[in-house]
């Protein structure tokens, strides 16, 4: 339950972060890509007619969470710190740094990139829930969807980075991606610590 509750905060906060990246970006074609990405996340795509937060709410039902439980959850201190970090990166830094910070977190779900580690985060978490909780992949619509959706999202902004993150900009973007991954690790570690305390 802790995982899904904190994930719901992460997913909702990303909408703000992508909006900051779009607001900072002067390139109309990139803004259009961001809006396309956000339409899939917030409105509808092939995985949900109601946006991806709906997938988390549906996934919560088999483990005893109501929509209210998910929507009214409070952040762990580490979740709050990570969300503040991403918010600052995407609002105060350049649009390319913000784009890199957001895009790298999509890569965490991509089985193609992380096959040597047993797959992306969504696949590995889903497998744990199947093995330890006796659920099926049909009970896990969020992780099932993100195994596919984030393949497209992983690839979506690579041409943009290849075009605009050149010269000295390349190192800046790589550093932003590293910092974003550090935030992601802190976010995940906080969830793990909270789960250990109740087990």
List each language-model region with its residue ranges.
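Short, charged, amphipathic alpha-helical segments
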Residues: 5, 32-36, 73, 144, ...
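Amphipathic alpha-helical segments within well-ordered protein domains
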Residues: 18-22, 57, 126-130, 158, ...
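Accessory, usually C-terminal, subdomains that scaffold auxiliary metal cofactors
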Residues: 134-177
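Active-site-proximal alpha-helical scaffolds that flank and shape metal-associated catalytic sites
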Residues: 32, 38-142, 182-186, 193-197
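Long, hydrophobic/aromatic-enriched structural stretches that serve as scaffold segments
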Residues: 1-26, 30-33
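Acidic, carboxylate-rich catalytic segments that either coordinate divalent cations
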Residues: 164-199
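Short acidic alpha-helix initiation/capping motifs at coil-to-helix transition points
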Residues: 9-14, 50, 117-123, 151-153
